[in-house]
Amino acid sequence: MPPVSRSSYSEDIVGSRRRRRSSSGSPPSPQSRCSSWDGCSRSHSRGREGLRPPWSELDVGALYPFSRSGSRGRLPRFRNYAFASSWSTSYSGYRYHRHCYAEERQSAEDYEKEESHRQRRLKERERIGELGAPEVWGPSPKFPQLDSDEHTPVEDEEEVTHQKSSSSDSNSEEHRKKKTSRSRNKKKRKNKSSKRKHRKYSDSDSNSESDTNSDSDDDKKRVKAKKKKKKKKHKTKKKKNKKTKKESSDSSCKDSEEDLSEATWMEQPNVADTMDLIGPEAPIIHTSQDEKPLKYGHALLPGEGAAMAEYVKAGKRIPRRGEIGLTSEEIGSFECSGYVMSGSRHRRMEAVRLRKENQIYSADEKRALASFNQEERRKRESKILASFREMVHKKTKEKDDK
């Protein structure tokens, strides 16, 4: 399809118009103009379909509702086809923007609807939280139901009377406080009024009698000094009374504490006698002050070696793990009858026990040997001293006889 030149097309239109004007001799009517323009546009559109705008005549009329003639469905008059093509592109852009605006408006309306629904639901929930929903669940009881086991009508009456008495006491206390506050306020007002009167009289007297005021000032100072002395004496007396009260209270507390302590000391031995001992009884300790504590070996708990050595000294069996509550005689009788009192299931524990017992036995043997040696030495020394005394005694007698 050959290209169309826009300049030649516009020149043909202008020439045809001039011919019509010259032939008629009068200005053409708007209807003739429109018909001529319509015919030109139709012929142009028939010949050149590729350059026709993408909308119909009705769409253009709807876009431009008010034309120059006042009718709504007429096309605008383009004097140049280039302007018509540019107008078509702008109209397509307008349609696109119009479509986007409609979508945005619809989304905004949906959001407003959702927001209003949410606010409505929120208000409804707040109302339900405050007032409740009796259609869903019943109203809560105004007064709690009392259980028959826990509360009885007598107890309820006592509680009511107690509450009434407490309320009456509180009301009476409040009434007393109000009375005292009123009396204090009245006294303050009287004092203020008397001070004001005294000031007025003093001002009037000062103008008339200055000498008498000086004397009265001296008298006032003396009175004030006397009052201060009295107050000081009263304070000192109060302090002394407080000190004496404190001392008397302290002494009474001490006496009561001493009485209580004596009572507790008297009661403690009785309690100790009545208490039953748990476990095997420890043998009586046979130790002298001269003997020093022996070392029973290593790997022993503090006091364990001495406790085990006491059993060995008394000639009793050392109690083992699992034998609490039995005496050594009972343990020995059970072992003689065939019971295994301390098995060898835990080999390491059994080895530790045997090592400790051997340490105690060896230490006890050493102690026994040491004591035996000491006893033998003492016997020898005593024998030597006795023989020496006899010899001295004999010699003294012989001298006396001579």
From Swiss-Prot:
BP GO terms, sorted: cell differentiation; regulation of gene expression; spermatogenesis
Superkingdom of the organism of origin: Eukaryota
Residue positions where Phosphoserine is found in the record: 23, 148
Disordered: annotated segments: 1-56, 105-290
Key words, A-Z: Differentiation, Nucleus, Phosphoprotein, Spermatogenesis, Transcription, Transcription regulation
Biased composition (Polar residues): 1-10
Segments of skewed composition (Basic and acidic residues): 105-129, 246-255
GO terms assigned for molecular function: chromatin binding
Bias-annotated ranges (Acidic residues): 206-217
Subcellular location: Nucleus
Biased composition (Low complexity): 23-36
Pfam families: NKAP, Nkap_C
Gene Ontology terms: cellular component: nucleus
Broad class of the protein's primary localization: nucleus
Biased composition range(s): Basic residues: 176-200, 222-245
KW Transcription (keyword) present: yes
Family, per entry: Belongs to the NKAP family.
Function recorded in the entry: Transcriptional repressor of Notch-mediated signaling. Required for spermatogenesis.
PANTHER family assigned to the protein according to its UniProt record, in alphabetical order: NF-KAPPA B ACTIVATING PROTEIN, NKAP-LIKE PROTEIN
Subunit structure: Interacts with RBPJ, CIR1 and HDAC3.
Name used for this protein in its record: NKAP-like protein
